[in-house]
Amino acid sequence: MAAAKAEMQLMSPLQISDPFGSFPHSPTMDNYPKLEEMMLLSNGAPQFLGAAGTPEGSGGNSSSSTSSGGGGGGGSNSGSSAFNPQGEPSEQPYEHLTTESFSDIALNNEKAMVETSYPSQTTRLPPITYTGRFSLEPAPNSGNTLWPEPLFSLVSGLVSMTNPPTSSSSAPSPAASSSSSASQSPPLSCAVPSNDSSPIYSAAPTFPTPNTDIFPEPQSQAFPGSAGTALQYPPPAYPATKGGFQVPMIPDYLFPQQQGDLSLGTPDQKPFQGLENRTQQPSLTPLSTIKAFATQSGSQDLKALNTTYQSQLIKPSRMRKYPNRPSKTPPHERPYACPVESCDRRFSRSDELTRHIRIHTGQKPFQCRICMRNFSRSDHLTTHIRTHTGEKPFACDICGRKFARSDERKRHTKIHLRQKDKKADKSVVASPAASSLSSYPSPVATSYPSPATTSFPSPVPTSYSSPGSSTYPSPAHSGFPSPSVATTFASVPPAFPTQVSSFPSAGVSSSFSTSTGLSDMTATFSPRTIEIC
């Protein structure tokens, strides 16, 4: 009897542990509360058997009471409820585990329901140690090989070294959840134990969407090795593309300008000029201006250098002029001095100084939005825009012609002033000529027409009337005392009227009369000509 009891006590732990080892595994069994209960029962089985064996020894034998009729009814009840007559444990003590625990798991534990959808769960407590070794050891191997074929072979070897059941359960802890998730997705198993990012991956069941959103590409490419290898090989492709995309954008506006500013500020300029060049870019707000500026960024440094060299060449000539030329305002009223060492210009207003500094730096912050042309002054930009719009607000007061700039109108009015000056000069030159002309034609008018008028009527009445003989013979007798002439004149008048009557042209008679009376004309008209002259 004692030997039989000892055999039962020795066999019962083995038979109790065997059902746990050979219990059929299924996806519904893979849940943490059931695993905890099974582990507790497997650890507490000897104590349970010891507690069950003491009543057998003290109160009576279950087998002897049934076979040989010994006492100890209480012991027989306990023995019959726990074990079969053949010494095998009955299934009644575990029926409540197989029914109640499954219902509780299905209703309460959502994590278990999420993870039951993955059939390939190959991790228990021993595989956790293996996965830790695997994640730490193959880092150099993955560094040597960029492809995951040898790693798959390592994984298959480690899995074959472990227990064959694929749907077994793991330890009841967050680490177990992380290991199970790692076994489900090999990319996560590589990264969980390697560094301190295990909480991120252990939270995969509770936060499924962040893992799918944040680590979709690293999972597929971080599988060859640990997180260090994933950072070494696959991820540089992404930062490289980002860096290649960002680098051409930033230097287009900032880095070349800063270098140009340093090169400009080193020879003979103050350091704050570089700051102005840096602040030049935010004013170019439109995208088109940014593109235009990016295309011109390479040649802009050369332009700036050329402007500095030109300013250096121009400055000495100004240096020779300014000390000799007095300024309109005294120096104490011009507190803003040019910071360039080779320039001694001073200004009474800060905006004038700012405008002047742009000459040294070559800065043109005002840009036309239509043609993208840059200007150093805002008023220049305003007048330039009028060339595009066609606006001409300045009109000439004399001719009404319109202009887009006031200086153009001034230049045009000077043309009118010159024309006025020319007209005035012409009038001054014409007035002496007119006076000289009035002096010369008066003798002609008095000398020639007056004899004609006097000569024409005088012969006509003399020709028709008889006093012709009396008029002419008297001067003839006085001027020519010879009687022959008087006789001739006396004889001529009788013939003269006949000619006049036949030919009414007074011109002929006048010509003859003037020829005959030339001495009288000179005597009568000589004083008149003297008076006019």
Swiss-Prot record:
One of its GO terms (biological process) is positive regulation of interleukin-1 beta production. Transcriptional regulator. Recognizes and binds to the DNA sequence 5'-GCG(T/G)GGGCG-3'(EGR-site) in the promoter region of target genes. Binds double-stranded target DNA, irrespective of the cytosine methylation status. Regulates the transcription of numerous target genes, and thereby plays an important role in regulating the response to growth factors, DNA damage, and ischemia. Plays a role in the regulation of cell survival, proliferation and cell death. Activates expression of p53/TP53 and TGFB1, and thereby helps prevent tumor formation. PANTHER family: EARLY GROWTH RESPONSE PROTEIN 1, KRUEPPEL-LIKE TRANSCRIPTION FACTOR. GO terms for molecular function: DNA binding; DNA-binding transcription activator activity, RNA polymerase II-specific; DNA-binding transcription factor activity; double-stranded methylated DNA binding; enzyme binding; hemi-methylated DNA-binding; histone acetyltransferase binding; promoter-specific chromatin binding. Binds to DNA motifs with the sequence 5'-GCG(T/G)GGGCG-3' via its C2H2-type zinc fingers. The first, most N-terminal zinc finger binds to the 3'-GCG motif, the middle zinc finger interacts with the central TGG motif, and the C-terminal zinc finger binds to the 5'-GCG motif. Binds double-stranded target DNA, irrespective of the cytosine methylation status. Has reduced affinity for target DNA where the cytosines have been oxidized to 5-hydroxymethylcytosine. Does not bind target DNA where the cytosines have been oxidized to 5-formylcytosine or 5-carboxylcytosine. Interacts with SNAI1 and SP1 upon 12-O-tetradecanoylphorbol-13-acetate (TPA) induction. Detected in lung vasculature and in mononuclear phagocytes. Detected in liver (at protein level). Expressed in the liver in a circadian manner. Residues 1-94, 161-237, 316-336, 407-478 are annotated as: Disordered. It comes from Mus musculus (Mouse). This is Early growth response protein 1. Residues 411-421 have a biased composition (Basic residues). Disruption phenotype: Mice appear grossly normal, but females are anestrous and infertile with an uterus weight that is roughly 30% of that of wild-type. Ovaries contain normal numbers of follicles, but lack corpora lutea. Serum progesterone levels are strongly reduced; estradiol levels are normal. The level of luteinizing hormone (LHB) in the pituitary is strongly reduced in males and not detectable in females. Responses to ischemia and hypoxia are blunted, leading to reduced tissue damage in response to ischemia and increased survival. Induction: By growth factors. Up-regulated in lung vasculature in response to reperfusion after ischemia. Up-regulated in liver in response to partial hepatectomy. Residues 68-77 have a biased composition (Gly residues). The record marks 334, 345, 349, 355, 373, 377, 401, 405, 411 as: Interaction with DNA. The gene is Egr1. There is a cross-link at residue 303 (Glycyl lysine isopeptide (Lys-Gly) (interchain with G-Cter in SUMO2)).
